Swiss-Prot record:
<dbReference type="GO" id="GO:0019171">
    <property type="term" value="F:(3R)-hydroxyacyl-[acyl-carrier-protein] dehydratase activity"/>
</dbReference>
<dbReference type="GO" id="GO:0009245">
    <property type="term" value="P:lipid A biosynthetic process"/>
</dbReference>
<dbReference type="GO" id="GO:0005737">
    <property type="term" value="C:cytoplasm"/>
</dbReference>
<keyword id="KW-0963">Cytoplasm</keyword>
<keyword id="KW-0443">Lipid metabolism</keyword>
<feature type="active site">
    <location>
        <position position="64"/>
    </location>
</feature>
<dbReference type="Pfam" id="PF07977">
    <property type="entry name" value="FabA"/>
</dbReference>
<comment type="similarity">
    <text>Belongs to the thioester dehydratase family. FabZ subfamily.</text>
</comment>
<protein>
    <recommendedName>
        <fullName>3-hydroxyacyl-[acyl-carrier-protein] dehydratase FabZ</fullName>
        <ecNumber>4.2.1.59</ecNumber>
    </recommendedName>
</protein>
<keyword id="KW-0441">Lipid A biosynthesis</keyword>
<keyword id="KW-0456">Lyase</keyword>
<dbReference type="InterPro" id="IPR013114">
    <property type="entry name" value="FabA_FabZ"/>
</dbReference>
<dbReference type="InterPro" id="IPR010084">
    <property type="entry name" value="FabZ"/>
</dbReference>
<dbReference type="GO" id="GO:0006633">
    <property type="term" value="P:fatty acid biosynthetic process"/>
</dbReference>
<dbReference type="GO" id="GO:0016020">
    <property type="term" value="C:membrane"/>
</dbReference>
<dbReference type="InterPro" id="IPR029069">
    <property type="entry name" value="HotDog_dom_sf"/>
</dbReference>
<keyword id="KW-0444">Lipid biosynthesis</keyword>
Length: 161
């Protein structure tokens, strides 16, 4: 059985890969603000692992910083939030239609190492809890297995209109 079709006892796809064409159906973000290129693992209602490929073609590198390009830390956090939004949509299924995931708060944010062009961010998000339409997550971003950023954050799921 391939990883794409492996299921656990609850029917959750453990090895499900969500490519960019599906991501743009799931969340409203677009270039230049789409900060997740692929989701390589989703365990509905639990966790997800996303990828952000950092390239020199990102528009913010013109000013952050021209002599030493550094991926802005706030965009690492945004990558975590967008990966969490994919997890929310995957968890809610059809009931997510007509809903948006709004970023609410960030706590305990730490940036450990700079990220630059050529790096691949592995974004690990873990659902800590949900109460009603408010979900809380813990996120970690790694490059080559090394922790570069971490945070806890919350989101609210509301009707789109």
């Amino acid at each position: 059985m391939s990883m794409d079709t492996a299921n656990n006892d609850q029917g959750t796809d453990l090895g499900k890969v969500i490519d960019i064409s599906r991501i743009i159906q799931m969340i409203p973000h677009r270039y230049p603000f789409l900060m997740v290129d692929r989701v390589v693992q989703v365990v509905a209602n639990e966790s997800a692992v996303g990828i952000k490929n950092v390239t020199i073609n990102e528009p913010f590198f013109q000013g952050h910083f021209p002599s030493r390009p550094v991926f802005p830390g706030v965009l690492i956090i945004e990558s975590m939030a967008q990966t969490a939004a994919v997890l929310v949509v995957e968890t809610l299924g059809e009931s997510a239609e007509g809903k948006l995931v709004y970023f609410m708060s960030v706590e305990n944010c730490r940036f450990r190492k700079p990220v630059g062009p050529g790096d691949q961010l592995m974004i690990h998000v873990f659902k800590e809890r949900s109460r009603g339409n408010v979900w809380k997550f813990r996120g970690e971003a790694k490059v080559d297995g090394v922790l570069v950023a971490e945070a806890t954050y919350a989101a609210m799921i509301l009707d789109e209109k």
